[in-house]
């Protein structure tokens, strides 16, 4: 049986079980109204369906932690409808339905190490590194003076993702991207690229 904890100990990225389904806590808010009992509002993402919900708990409630296994694995390849990962410890192949990791796949690159989440012996999702380094393969050229006004332009990355980058970024540049928000962080020198 899964462990139960006091709702006041909840944290972002914690895995909980709600109505028999696994959820990942996206955000939470402790609310203390002027009248009445304090409560905790939790925003969570269903790890099976990807749907987000909001759950309200009394401050005296306890929640059940979802019994997840987390496995480090390296992304190997993608076929028609699945992504395939090689576990680091056991060197077993794990396959995940492409629909289950649609958002994460935008920044997934061959050889990248990720965390695979396994729930009741079924892989249901992955966690990417917080930031990834990717090459810009397509963007409009920057012009002298563009940077004075600030602003941004779309750029297509080697994984197919399209993000907004500053005007001074050119094709062939290596950029660091936050995988949680999809935002450009910085441009890297080619020598800095791992």
From Swiss-Prot:
Q: Name one GO cellular component term.
A: cytoplasm
> Which pathway is this protein assigned to?
Protein biosynthesis; polypeptide chain elongation
Q: Which UniProt keywords apply?
A: Cytoplasm, Elongation factor, Protein biosynthesis
| InterPro entries assigned to the protein according to its UniProt record, in alphabetical order | Elong-fact-P_C, NA-bd_OB-fold, Rib_uL2_dom2, Transl_elong_fac_P/YeiP, Transl_elong_KOW-like, Transl_elong_P/YeiP_cen, Transl_elong_P/YeiP_CS, Transl_elongation_fac_P
Q: Which GO terms describe its molecular function?
A: translation elongation factor activity
Q: Which Pfam families match?
A: EFP, EFP_N, Elong-fact-P_C
Judging by the UniProt lineage, the source's domain of life is Bacteria
Q: Does the keyword Cytoplasm apply?
A: yes
Task: Supply one GO BP term.
Answer: peptide biosynthetic process
Question: According to its UniProt record, where is this protein located?
Answer: Cytoplasm
Where are the coiled-coil regions? none
The UniProt similarity line reads: Belongs to the elongation factor P family.
- What PANTHER family does the entry give? ELONGATION FACTOR P, ELONGATION FACTOR P (EF-P) FAMILY PROTEIN
Q: What does this protein do?
A: Involved in peptide bond synthesis. Stimulates efficient translation and peptide-bond synthesis on native or reconstituted 70S ribosomes in vitro. Probably functions indirectly by altering the affinity of the ribosome for aminoacyl-tRNA, thus increasing their reactivity as acceptors for peptidyl transferase.
Instruction: Give the protein's recorded name.
Output: Elongation factor P
Source organism of the structure: Hydrogenobaculum sp. (strain Y04AAS1)
Gene symbol here is efp
